[in-house]
């Protein structure tokens, strides 16, 4: 219900304090409603399966136990049910992530939203999709998740490359940052999906997959910091000159040195520069993918080069280069204390997570290890029970 409630409220926030194009607002709301309906359809399917056995529930833990064969042979979600339910759940959550081709609402929503709402969208809302895939889709439908793993890896890699190329093509500063989110969240899906089974049913390179899951979790948090920071820095200059045309910016480092320094630091975090938060999740996702497919890992790694291309190009056009030539040059004034405080806080966390990633990994290690062990056990310690229940 709370997931469903986020759909109209997201649209309300996007429309806050701005004259939103009605078509864009309807698109955002429609995408959110479609996301919710897919999730509800998937959960409804698995609940109906359990209903005749007195287990008609939406309790995530109980549904996960059934899906993982812990209730077999008396009750189990067979392969066909898990496949259909997983696809529905994944599509529903992927719209929120978002990954290609479910991303179309995101650039328009960010462009129309006020700066604080863009920061919330990037830092919190997108993570609801990733959390749902990890917390609900995989544990309840492990057979479907494993069967779709190759398709998910392809989708993650394509999102990385597509999002980067789309960002390169933008002239709107905020839309460029929005497309960068599509690329960065592709690493989340890549790290999560590199689940590879051997002929004996055991996970091949289990430690690599655990690394990928840890990377996916870390990347979601790191992206929440760097992307929120980039949107904030776009908003700071937009509030002064009221445009986002990259071709009309220039020389802001000289006009607003403190703002320029904070902005470059946060954009470097989004770039994935070593020592900043964006580097850890991306490099570990690529390392995990190397065990799954060396070719796909190389393609995913090339996304880092493309990311450097559009981030450095934006820095050169906005903060360096010739003098500012857009409207309202008289409004370009140094940032105030409130803006500086927000920028410093975000940059502090970007540096903290970059130089001391163990701060997060230590918190999540126990949960991610249990997550991987539980799903691996579906294909190792409990295959006979699942077969008896029609799971394979």
Regions found by a protein language model. Give the residues of each.
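Small-residue-rich segments of transmembrane alpha-helices in multi-pass membrane proteins
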Residues: 1, 116-129, 181-194, 256-263
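Juxtamembrane/interfacial segments at transmembrane-helix boundaries in multi-pass membrane proteins
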Residues: 1-94, 98-101, 133-151, 194-214, ...
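Alpha-helical transmembrane segments
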Residues: 79-92, 214-229, 295-308
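Alpha-helical transmembrane segments and their helix-entry boundary regions
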Residues: 105, 118-120, 176-177, 212-216, ...
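Internal transmembrane alpha-helices of multipass membrane proteins
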Residues: 110, 123-124, 148-208
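Membrane-interface alpha-helices at helix entry/exit sites of multi-pass transporters
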Residues: 113-123, 244-261, 297-303
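Residue-level recognition of transmembrane alpha-helices
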Residues: 123, 177-181, 219-220, 263-266, ...
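Predominantly late transmembrane helices and immediately cytosolic-facing juxtamembrane segments
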Residues: 227-231, 296-331
